[in-house]
């Protein structure tokens, strides 16, 4: 295929697609230019079905530092593991694409997005999402797209599609919404306590904008799209399925209805093992034993899936016996740990999260050096999910994509209520340890984070709670579930997480397993989530009604003083010599920003006070008319030099020592002598003149005696 170019304009920026010039050995490849952002997307598919029981889709978003004209950091000077932003973007693209493959599709698919040039005012992630869908759509990979995504901002009551950097900074909303022509299938959002009505309108505005991008993709596919390949889908043997269902469906249904998680898992596993043992023995000599046993496992999974959904849609009974809109039992505890700066333990049924707060000087902020201009990140929310939380063994190591994503969701939910840097000049870190999990652990970590922040004395604007909503749909009828547990998440159609305060929503995240959901379902889920959120906030506020007025005794105390910008270099000193000396003497930590705000941190108030005294002395300036208790440091013929304070000296001219004539300075003053002086002049070079006689009353003039004449 020779190079073909397709051009349109979207959200005020040129959108150019090039096909047929690069990466021609991939199943499908596109170069998408949006503004000055350029993303290459290449998609490939394995020729055979993978052996696992899941769809092996891998989506990568690779940030090349050359795209922003930057050198990579570190000793190796080349790109290493993906940044947090790159990982989150890869997840953002994966989530709307995954539901668009057929049930039973098991071929491995890779979608690799490479950012080749970066424009901070034209979203590279949205260009990559567009390119991912288009590359799959024009390829021979059986993808049931296209899909597209947009970012939505909200400024002065107006919605803005794909806002630029300046607009996003002013926006009350940072929403990414993706979907197909028919429906929304992915949502990711942070918001400044916006109402459900505004959030719903934003979602619909986003989906409306998506239509333009999908239509553009369809035009391109019509010109350059390949015929889709015939691939084998995972299908079980119909006779085998009928046999197992007839014999064991009743037993499996009974096991699924056991209310307690561990007991239910044991009961269902017992039935499954019994069935597997029977069929393994029956077909022991069959050369297709492996395929048969794979089908047995798949059939049992489908039977469990069908029963969970039947219970909810027909009987309106959930596996643990709850009503459709009922939350599991709640418990909230603060001060679970001594010594730390704040801690909160939140439990919802069999899901439990411990959040631990650490406060630090602003010097501990994380420096983010990616494609965007370098910036400092003050608030960190980290999420850990150990395997013991679900009673299993497993891999331990660096945080995976899921943990990074859940941590970022909690971060977005909580950062909206944090005090400003001026109000609270600390770096803030929350670590969520999931101690037990049966679904919705990310939302439990948000609730625990609220407890830890308030217990630690962080003056948040309002407590935040989170809830996960689910959906069971047969295409015609549907049921929205409140507070989904693991089984409902696994066999359900939607995981819709909503976090916020009593005033409004601070974060949304939605993933679905079906092609999309309607505005009616979204509206119902948001309304149901609001009711649940308020119930959880009642429990949180009953435990701790408001942030404590004082920090924990173990937290660093802080005091801030303001100095003139031109005095910053005085406090720091040559090569940091002065500030290092202060820190060595007092044991404090000191941060100085570019505006002259000096923050002093220590657990010892006396050390803070001493540091303030030292810095005040360093930046103090002599003023005309002020009196100082000075020390003579040098004597010259023309006068004496005195030290007013710290490094500020003044000259007392010989004529300013006394009202009477002084013949020799050394007759009146000596080095080391303390004297009181008054500043009488400061010249344009900062040189100070002082006077001793100005503090002495001027003696009256003596009248000349008249001579007597005889």
From Swiss-Prot:
Any single GO CC term annotated in Swiss-Prot or TrEMBL for this entry: cytosol
Cell location: Cytoplasm
Annotated EC: 2.7.7.8
Enzyme class per UniProt: transferase
Residues passing through the membrane, by range: none
Needed co-factor(s): Mg(2+)
Protein keywords: Cytoplasm, Magnesium, Metal-binding, Nucleotidyltransferase, RNA-binding, Transferase
GO terms classed as biological process: mRNA catabolic process; RNA processing
Any one Pfam family match given in the protein's UniProt record, by short name: S1
InterPro entries: ExoRNase_PH_dom1, ExoRNase_PH_dom2, ExoRNase_PH_dom2_sf, KH_dom, KH_dom_type_1, KH_dom_type_1_sf, NA-bd_OB-fold, PNPase
Reactions catalysed according to its record: RNA(n+1) + phosphate = RNA(n) + a ribonucleoside 5'-diphosphate
Amino-acid positions noted as binding Mg(2+) in the UniProt annotation, renumbered to this chain: 489, 495
SUPFAM superfamilies registered for this protein in UniProt: Eukaryotic type KH-domain (KH-domain type I) (SSF54791), Nucleic acid-binding proteins (SSF50249), Polynucleotide phosphorylase/guanosine pentaphosphate synthase (PNPase/GPSI), domain 3 (SSF46915), Ribonuclease PH domain 2-like (SSF55666), Ribosomal protein S5 domain 2-like (SSF54211)
GO terms assigned for molecular function: 3'-5'-RNA exonuclease activity; magnesium ion binding; polyribonucleotide nucleotidyltransferase activity; RNA binding
KH domain location: 556-615
Domain S1 motif: 625-693
Domain of life: Bacteria
HAMAP family named in the record: PNPase
Family: Belongs to the polyribonucleotide nucleotidyltransferase family.
Protein function: Involved in mRNA degradation. Catalyzes the phosphorolysis of single-stranded polyribonucleotides processively in the 3'- to 5'-direction.
NCBIfam families: polynuc_phos, PRK11824.1
Protein's name according to its UniProt entry: Polyribonucleotide nucleotidyltransferase
Native species: Streptococcus pyogenes serotype M3 (strain ATCC BAA-595 / MGAS315)
């Amino acid at each position: 295929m020779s190079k073909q170019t397709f051009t349109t304009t979207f959200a005020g920026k040129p959108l150019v697609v090039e096909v047929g010039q690069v990466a021609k050995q991939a199943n499908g490849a596109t170069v998408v230019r949006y503004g000055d952002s350029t993303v290459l997307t290449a998609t490939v598919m394995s020729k055979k079905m993978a052996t696992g029981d899941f769809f092996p889709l891998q989506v990568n978003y690779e940030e090349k530092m050359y795209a922003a004209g930057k050198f990579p950091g570190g000793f190796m000077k080349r790109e290493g593991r993906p940044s947090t932003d790159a990982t989150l973007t890869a997840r953002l693209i994966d989530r709307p694409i995954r539901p668009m493959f057929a049930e039973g599709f098991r071929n491995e698919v890779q979608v690799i997005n490479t950012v080749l040039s970066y424009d901070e005012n034209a979203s590279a992630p949205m260009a990559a999402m567009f390119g991912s869908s288009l590359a799959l759509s024009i390829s021979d990979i059986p993808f049931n797209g296209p899909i597209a995504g947009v970012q939505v901002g909200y400024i002065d009551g107006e919605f803005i599609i794909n806002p630029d950097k300046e607009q996003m900074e002013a926006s009350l909303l940072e929403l990414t919404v993706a979907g197909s022509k028919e429906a929304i299938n992915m949502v990711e959002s942070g918001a400044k306590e916006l109402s459900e009505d505004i959030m719903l309108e934003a979602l619909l505005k986003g989906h409306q904008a998506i239509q333009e991008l999908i239509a553009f993709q369809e035009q391109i596919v019509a010109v350059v799209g390949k015929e889709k390949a015939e691939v084998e889908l995972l299908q079980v043997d119909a006779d085998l399925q009928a046999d197992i269902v007839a014999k064991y469906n009743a037993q499996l249904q009974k096991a699924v209805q056991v209310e307690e998680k561990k007991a239910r898992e044991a009961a269902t596993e017992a039935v499954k093992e019994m069935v597997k043992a029977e069929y393994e023995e029956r077909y022991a000599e069959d050369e297709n034993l492996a395929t048969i046993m794979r089908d047995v496992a798949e059939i049992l999974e489908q039977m469990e899936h069908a029963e969970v959904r039947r219970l909810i849609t027909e009987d309106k009974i959930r596996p643990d016996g709850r009503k459709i809109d009922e939350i599991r039992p709640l418990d909230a505890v603060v001060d679970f740990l001594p010594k730390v700066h704040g801690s909160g333990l939140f439990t919802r049924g069999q899901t439990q999260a411990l959040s631990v707060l650490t406060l630090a000087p602003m010097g501990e902020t994380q420096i983010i050096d990616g494609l965007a201009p370098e910036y400092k990140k003050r608030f960190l929310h980290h999420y850990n999910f150990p395997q013991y939380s679900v009673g299993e063994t497993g891999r331990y190591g660096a945080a995976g994509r899921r943990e990074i994503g859940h941590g970022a969701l909690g971060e977005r939910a909580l950062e909206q209520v944090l005090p400003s840097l001026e109000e609270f000049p600390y770096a803030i870190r929350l670590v969520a340890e999931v101690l037990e999990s049966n679904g919705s652990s990310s939302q439990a970590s948000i609730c625990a984070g609220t407890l830890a922040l308030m217990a630690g004395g962080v003056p948040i604007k309002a407590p935040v709670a989170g809830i996960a909503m689910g959906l069971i749909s047969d295409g015609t009828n549907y049921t929205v579930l409140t507070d989904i547990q693991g089984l409902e998440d696994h066999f359900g159609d939607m995981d819709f997480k909503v976090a916020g305060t009593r005033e409004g929503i601070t974060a949304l995240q939605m993933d679905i397993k079906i092609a999309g959901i309607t505005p009616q379902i979204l509206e119902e889920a948001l309304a149901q989530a609001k009711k649940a959120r308020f119930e959880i906030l009642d429990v949180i506020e009953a435990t701790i009604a408001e942030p404590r007025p004082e920090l924990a005794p173990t937290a660093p105390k802080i005091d801030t003083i303001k100095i003139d910008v031109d005095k910053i270099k005085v406090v720091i000193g040559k090569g940091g010599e002065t500030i290092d000396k202060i820190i060595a003497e007092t044991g404090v930590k000191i941060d100085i920003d570019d505006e002259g705000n000096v923050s002093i941190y220590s657990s010892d108030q006396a050390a803070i006070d001493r540091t303030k005294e030292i810095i005040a002395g360093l930046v103090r300036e002599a003023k005309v008319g002020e009196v100082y208790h000075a020390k003579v440091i040098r004597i010259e013929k023309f006068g004496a030099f005195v030290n007013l304070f710290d490094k500020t000296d003044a000259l007392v001219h010989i004529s300013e020592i006394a009202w009477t004539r002084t013949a020799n300075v050394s007759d009146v003053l000596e080095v080391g002598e303390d004297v009181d002086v008054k500043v009488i002049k400061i010249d344009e070079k900062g040189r100070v003149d002082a006077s001793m006689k100005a503090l002495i009353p001027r003696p009256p003039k003596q009248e000349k005696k008249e001579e007597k004449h005889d």
